[in-house]
Every structure is written in C-alpha cells, then in structure tokens.
From Swiss-Prot:
Protein's UniProt keywords contain Zinc-finger: no
E.C. code: 1.-.-.-
Family: Belongs to the cytochrome P450 family.
Pathway where it operates: Secondary metabolite biosynthesis
Organism of provenance: Mycosarcoma maydis
Residue positions with a glycan: 2, 100, 210, 400
Named cofactor requirement(s): heme
Record protein name field: Cytochrome P450 monooxygenase CYP3
Taxonomic placement: Eukaryota, Fungi, Dikarya, Basidiomycota, Ustilaginomycotina
C-alpha cells in the first residue's frame, strides 16, 4: 500500500485506498472509526456555524461583542434603549453581532426613511427565527407580519389591507362603539362607580379581542366564554414572548437548539399547539355558521363565501389572516390603552383639556358621536399615546432581498434589520420635548412642521413600523384608541388608586417583550357629574 508525506511535515498521511468492490473510500480506518470521524466533522461544522458571526465585512461601526454570543449579554433587559444609547457612539445606523447573526440597527427617522422607504422594495422580507418559525409555528400558519416575502404573503397582505383600509374601518364603527361602551360598563360595575380601584388590563384586552372577533368571525364573547378569553389572552402573550427578537439565545447560537433539556423549544411547541387548538375551533365554528346560513358579515366569512377569494387563498393563508387579526389587537391597542388610562389618571390636566373639547361639542353632555374624528385634541391624544408608549419598541425585523448601500456601506442581501421604533419615536429632531406627552404636536399644521415631516418620510409615528411592511391594521388600531378615549373621558374622571410608575421607559413590565405593557397598577373611574349613564347601564 503506497503512502505519501504531508507537505511541510515529516508525518505520513493515512493510506488512501479505493475499494473497487464496495465503492467506499477508506483511510486505512475501521468503519466504527469512520462513523466517529464523520460525527466529529458534523459537530465541528455545526459548532463553527454557531460561533462564527454573520458578515463582518459590512462597513458599518458597532460594538465588537464577545466570542460565540456576540453582544447578547451586553444588550440587557431593554434592547431598544441600549441601541438608542449606542447610537450616540456609533451613529444612527450601526451593526451588532448577536451570536452568529449580524444585525443592522436603524435608530433615527432620517435613516429609517432612507432604508425602509427609499429602499423599501429591497427591505420587504422577514428573517427566519428558529424558535418562532421552526418550533412554535411548525404545524400552523405564520402571521402575515412574520411571513417572508412571497406571492402568498403578497396575497395575504392585499386581503388584509382591503379589509382594514379607511373605508372598511369606517364600516366597523358600530362594532368599535359597542365594544368600547361595553368596556365602560364593565369598568363602571367592577369599580362600583369609582368606589373601588380596578386593574385595567382585562377591559382593554376583551375590547380588543371582541372587536377582532366581530370583524373577522362575526361573533363576540359574552359573559360566559368557557375560559376562551383567558386562554387566548394567555397564549397570545406567551407567543409574543417567543416572537420577540429578544426571546431566545438559540435563535442566534444554533448549537443551543440541540441541548438535551431545551425548555425554550418545549415551551414554544406547547404554545403553538394551544394556539392551533383555539384558532381551529374559531375557524370551524364560523365555517359551520356559513354553511348553515347563520353567519354575520365578517372578513373570513366573506372569503369563505366568495369563490374568487377561495381560489386565490389557501386554507393556510386564511389561517394566517385570522391569526394576524386575533393577535394584533392584544399586541397593540390593549397595551397602549392600559398605559394611557394609567397616564391620564396621573395627569388630570390632560383629562380636563379633553373634557373641555367634549363640552364645546356637546354642551348638554350627551353621548358623543365618534363616526368622524372631529374631536381634534382627543384624536391627537391617540397618536401621542401610541408614540410615547410605543408598544413595539423594536419592530418586526426585516431582511433585504437584494444588496443595499447606505453611506457607502454595502449591506448584502439576507441581512437582518431592526427598526428601533422606540428611538425614532423619541427622536428630538422630529419630536420637540420627546419625553413629554404633548398631543398638540399632532395638531400643528404649519409649513415648518410639514417640512420636518417630509424630510423624515411623512410618518407621524413609528408605532406601526414604516415602509412596505408597515402594519396594515394602523387605521383600525388608532380608531379604537380614539373611540375608547372619547368614551373614557366623557363618562369618567380618572384618578390613581395608590402610587405607581407610569414613565414610558421604566414602567414596563418586561423591557424585552415583543409588545411591552406597564407594570400592574390600579385606577379609580368616577362617573362625571351630569353625564347620562344610561348608554352603559342599559347594556346587557
């Protein structure tokens, strides 16, 4: 058997023989040794994939990070605020290495406009995250917002955008009014007309869910829901924790996915199964009502009855639309309103301004009409609340489908982008006194303000993202916030019940959450003198 020396060494290479009978290449090694060798190569390859960072050639500044984990542990419990502070050193756009993924972080309105608007056709897709896409959603649909760009995603977004545009949302106003008044009724009863403090979470969560249910399924949960409300609220919150880009180190260090006791994957799989169970139940019950001719007009019901829509959308795509509708309200509207009622309780001067506007329009204190947003101060309050308590501190991540150049830095296709909407919403150049609650900023129609808007992409707030993958539910969410604020300030004087923190930065329950919400607190809602309570007392 011939042997050859390794170049530059005195060692001999293993014998290389081709076995013509078996067709196997054998390095003078036994079969068991070969198995071990192959396994070692596989593990080494996997390890290298886990520990080597993404494309370090991107010519952008940023923190260096640590071996294997990158900057994971440096980011702390509030990634958005870490990025905002880091931008002071590295600039509005910088890169950060998290595990084996290199992320480009965008921290200012100007930079966001350039990347997400001017390069919008490239930054149109979503990156894949193992725990959410590969485990939790393994046997079910992705939401529209978490789907990579494709013809299927395009069709789903088109269907959702049509169902959630301004005219469509206007047609949902009877539903929004009904659910907002129902929330007022529950607050009135549970708080014993202001004698008892209430924790506001469930009122706005139920309002959000019932609005979504009526709009999407044509039904609402009553007093008895067999635990459906609690199950959906809990599971959607758990799913959101998995969906967050901050959720799991195994999304950035693949080797961790193979640890024998993988609690993250086990929990994610269970949330996925629980979610699939109630989503299937909602769909099948609607399908039954449609077949029996007992359905109410709704988004999914209309799809099921429309032959052309059924041809364009598969069951999985319809499931994706339904899932997006159910989860979106809890993620956005509910958490925004929870913070807002807590803020109003501590700021009676803001309540007085809203109530003065109501009195100017309705001197007899009759029930306000909310079909048009003519209460301009309260309308501005809704926008300001979504800006200052920005629930999505880091928007759903993007990935570019083609190379993008920013300030001479070429960012290759497939790179992950984070839009730091928290930093954008408290940007001092766009928003004067950014940490103050000033609804008046959205009432300024001056030419100078319009110039600032145009320079920064014409986006009023970054609460719903920006560019071609901006949340299509923005009109519905803002209309819900506006309507609820009108009725809350019409019916109640709101006051704190005990001391609590309501600062938008420090009051959050979990700064790493996908959709942040305030730490628990109580408020008292006392009926205002002279206001007719019959619209809520009569609600059954």
């Amino acid at each position: 058997m011939n042997t050859t020396k390794l170049l530059g060494t005195g060692a001999l290479s293993p014998s290389f023989v081709f076995d013509h009978d078996s067709g196997n290449a054998i390095f003078g090694l036994s079969s068991s040794t070969l198995v071990v060798l192959v396994a070692m190569i596989a593990v080494s390859t996997l390890t290298l994939k886990s520990v080597l960072p993404g494309d370090r050639s991107i010519n952008l500044p940023g923190p260096r990070g640590w071996p294997i984990v990158g900057s994971w542990f440096d980011l702390g419990n509030n990634w958005a605020e870490y990025f905002r502070q880091a931008a002071k050193e590295y600039g509005d756009v910088f890169k950060v290495h998290i595990g084996n993924r290199t992320v480009v972080v965008v921290n200012s309105p100007k930079a966001a406009h350039i990347l997400f608007n001017e390069h919008g056709s490239s930054l149109i897709s979503r990156p894949w995250f193992y725990t959410f896409h590969g485990v939790l959603s393994k046997s079910s649909a992705f939401t529209i917002g978490t789907s990579a760009w494709s013809d299927s995603t395009k069709n789903k977004r088109k269907a959702a955008a049509t169902a959630l545009n301004r005219p469509a949302v206007q047609s949902y106003m009877p539903i929004i009014v009904e659910e907002s008044l129902d929330a007022v009724r529950r607050i009135l009863n549970d708080g014993n007309a202001g004698k008892n403090g209430i924790v506001p979470y469930s009122y706005f969560q139920r309002l959000a869910l019932n609005t979504s249910f009526q709009v999407n399924y044509g039904f609402r949960m009553g007093e008895r829901d067999d635990g459906l409300f609690d199950e959906i609220s809990e599971v959607i919150a758990k799913v959101a924790s998995v969906r967050a880009v901050t959720g799991s180190l195994q999304d950035y260090v693949p080797l961790m996915r193979y640890l024998p006791a993988n609690a993250k994957s086990k929990a994610a799989a269970s949330y996925g199964l629980r979610r699939k169970k109630f989503m299937s139940k909602l769909y099948e019950e609607l399908e039954q009502r449609v077949n029996q001719g007992k359905d109410e007009s709704c988004i999914t019901g209309n799809i099921l009855k429309d032959t052309e829509s059924r041809k364009k959308l598969s069951r999985l795509e319809i499931d994706s639309i339904c899932l997006s509708m159910v989860s979106a309200g809890l993620d956005t509207f509910a958490n925004t309103m929870i913070w807002t009622i807590g803020f109003l309780a501590k700021h009676p001067e803001i309540q007085r301004k809203a109530q003065a506007e109501l009195l100017a329009h309705y001197p007899n204190r009759e029930l306000p009409h909310v079909d048009s947003e003519d209460l301009v101060y309260i309308h501005a309050m809704a926008k300001e609340a979504s800006r200052l308590f920005n629930v999505f501190r880091i928007c759903l991540p993007r990935t570019n489908v083609s190379d993008v150049t920013y300030n001479n830095a070429v960012i290759p296709a497939g790179t992950t982008f984070f839009l730091n909407s928290w930093a954008c919403n408290v940007d001092a150049e766009k928003f004067a006194d950014p940490f103050e609650f000033k609804p008046e900023r959205f009432m300024d129609k001056s030419a100078s303000n319009a110039h600032v808007e145009n320079k920064m992409g014409g986006v009023e707030t970054y609460a719903f993202g920006m560019g071609r993958r901006m949340c299509p539910g923005v009109f519905l969410a803002l209309r819900e916030i506006y309507t609820t604020l009108v009725f809350l300030t019409h019916f109640f004087d709101i006051a704190p019940d005990g001391e609590y923190d309501i600062d938008p930065l420090t009051a959050v329950e979990d700064g790493r959450a996908f959709s942040v919400r305030p730490k628990p607190f109580k408020v008292r809602c006392t009926p205002r003198p002279g206001v007719d309570l019959s619209p809520v007392l009569d609600k059954q």
